[in-house]
Regions:
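Short, charged beta-turn/beta-strand-edge "cap" motif at the junction between a beta-strand
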Residues: 27-31
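C-terminal terminal-subdomain/extension
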Residues: 1, 5, 9-14, 75-124
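Compact nucleic-acid interaction/catalytic patches
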Residues: 32-37, 42-75
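Loop/turn positions that initiate beta-strands
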Residues: 18-19
Length: 124
């Protein structure tokens, strides 16, 4: 088995870390839903199901004007290539097989903002 394939297989079977940023493949989508290969934040690892809840990131900084978004700066901790916006309103469940590698992790203040937005969104 090629080394890259083995590495991807091993990652999909390991424990994901919550509030870490990973590269994910969201495939193709319709409308305004984020797709393709992009960074995303794992907010909840559902390891017993081999799934996780993620928030996709976009490098389109104009997205900040939308509700339920958080700016994620390019820092040593996040290890992003450029400043990005977390699209909290587009959180979704994906199979762990769609995750290819760890990029970085969020700062505590960013985690707090995201948790507050999720609570506000789902206040039923």
């Amino acid at each position: 088995m090629p080394l890259l394939t083995l590495a991807l297989k091993d990652l999909s079977e390991c424990m994901l870390k919550e509030y870490f940023i990973y590269n994910v493949d969201l495939g193709t989508t319709d409308g305004h839903v984020q797709g393709y290969s992009r960074p995303a934040i794992v907010i909840k690892a559902l390891n017993e199901l081999n799934m996780c809840i993620i928030i996709p990131l976009t490098s389109n900084l104009e997205s900040q004007r939308l509700s339920y978004t958080v700016m994620i700066k390019k820092t040593h901790s996040t290890n992003l290539k450029e400043d990005s916006v977390a699209l909290v309103f587009q959180l979704r469940i994906i199979d762990n097989k769609r995750i290819s590698n760890e990029i970085g992790k969020l700062e505590e203040y960013q985690i707090g903002k995201i948790k507050a937005m999720i609570n506000e969104m789902f206040a039923i």
